[in-house]
Amino acid sequence: MLAGGGGKGAYQIGVWKYLHECGLDQYVCAVSGTSVGALNAALFASGNYQRAEDLWLNIQPSQILSPKKISVPEIVGWIGRAGLVKGIYGVAAGAATVSMQALAAGVATMLGRRYAFSRDGLIGLIKQGLDFSAIQTSNMPCYATCLAIPECSIRRFDLRQYSEEEATTLLLASSAIPLVFDSEEFRGERYYDGGIPLVGDNVPIKPVYDLGLDCIIVVHLSQDYVIDHSLCPNAKIVEIVPQVNLGGAVNGTLDFTAAGSQWRIRQGYHDAEKVFGMFVEVAKLKRVNELFLQAFQRSEQAYQQRSQTLQAERHKQLEAQELDRFSELCKGLGITP
């Protein structure tokens, strides 16, 4: 299970790298993700680790945060269409709530320019990195979590069931951060990032738990999220939590630089090793013992076979000697045997 977190998602590639090197990734039978976690889940379902790592190591901010000129009035309309401000992003200023106009201007100022971002660059990355035919024919469910608006209801989509175009739209929707990207339309409904606080699900365990899996690996991108294990009473949840802060909004979530990806991949690998290292070493030792036992058994079998062969040869030699003695005896008695 892969949590959302924008540019911090490179951390999950590091976790995958460790599992891949140890051969543990072959035992994963379902993946689920929100936002960048959904993209990484799709990369995992595509089955090509090296392609996923190359994508993250060569990523450029301009590929994700593609400029799209937009004015403050347009941002106001955009926020209004999303239908999220009053329900989620109303900001109290004393006894009053900041108006949509003030919020829009603040967002534009925060971004440093009067524009939001298009999805053109991410669409290119999706087409470059994903093997949709592999996803569609896989036995591995691959869930993307999105938030339907304006009702703010959580929706889960198994990407195997959709065409390349529809799956791309769902991945864009799952990562459509309000105030940064526009919402996405899918089959007549509009969707935003599935990890929006309070109403979304940034750690989407439910889809894989509902499959009846008894062990779920959760790869967090934040040190703050706490999972209620009582909601999954029949499953063991193994959590991989960043041992260092992966960054905030600007230097983490919106950090789509190659340098940022490199150190987060290293950190993910390191943290996965800390969680699974003992298990892997025990498994290796068990495997060594199994190989030793198999070698011993083969040696024992070879010894038994050789012993039986020698005994058979000795028996033939004794029979031949007895036959020679009998022939000599008969000859001495003048009897023809």
Question: Where are the language model's segments positioned?
Answer:
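Patatin-like phospholipase
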Residues: 1-34, 42-337
